[in-house]
Amino acid sequence: MANQTASYVVVALCLLVLVAEHAEARQPRLVPAIFVFGDSTVDVGNNNFLGGTRKEGRANFPQYGVDFPTSKPTGRFSNGFNTADRLAQLLGFPMSPPAYLSLTRRTIRSQMFKGINFASGGSGLGDHTGRLVVGEVISMTLQVETFATVVEHMYQSAGSKRTASFLSRSIFFISTGSNDMFEYSFSRSNDRKFLAGLVASYKYYLKALYHLGARKFSIVSIPPLGCTPSQRLRRLEQMGTQGCFDPLNDLSLESYPLLAAMLEELAHELPGMAYSLGDAYTMVSFVFANPQTNDWSFTELEAACCGEGPFGASGCNQTVPLCGNRDNHLFWDANHPTQAVSGIAAQTLFVGNQTFVNPINVLQLANM
């Protein structure tokens, strides 16, 4: 029975990949705009414009962007497109909306009714997350506050009624929390308190966005961070059978039901709120268990494509050699997925079943 269930999930996921690729090729816009918040998994270049961000918090140099259409680094922590890009494409856009800090006062006003990306690599749910590691980041507090100024411009331009209608039909895509967990994992002072605080912070920001007009939320939970190349270098006695850092994976796994419960409660509390929660832990675990299917073939699940040293976990830059085939690597650098994985993640968020996305997928969310 277990084998039959696994086979069914493999077939279902392969089918959804085919459906999503077909949709991407011919789909008109399903929503008026997409607004993106979060960390380096969805940053498209905001950190390029922060003077106090160290190199660890930037991706505006080779080899980043080698597979982007321009073959140039953009600030995405990827060899090409990231998950925000791929999801935006499935919703009918060319790619993620541009980074807020790349816009001028004039272009903000022309772009705001198409969508804007506020995400910042290194940031998290805590106001101080990322500062010790990468220096200056745009915290979630500042991301939401910046969006609030954009909403003011919308009201001035289109009036309150049209703006409220526009925002209620747009998608708000959020991927955050991993950096908070990375930093906390070195102390492990009180797991229960940490996770409760993490989810409470998430709830605070969601309510703030709701009161600014957001209604449709696409949220990605925290993946098994202990399996990233950077974390495979930690204490060997705490490594699991797959060579992953189990204490960090345990935290990631424990965070999901808390996040799911909070979202369910919040949707009952806030009239008109709808959400789609992607279970990133289950998604990544599924790929680990099924590295080769009819639609993908990952032959390297541990080492980064761009980097040197054990697991390629050090220094993705123009001096290090790249792997020969980016599409068969799970990880691009020490902490981020390849474009190939980001595409699978976005497709799963878009049309996945409740094994991976709850209570509805993003396509259903967009059509509400």
What is the role of each PLM region?
Residues 2-368:
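Conserved active-site regions of diverse hydrolases
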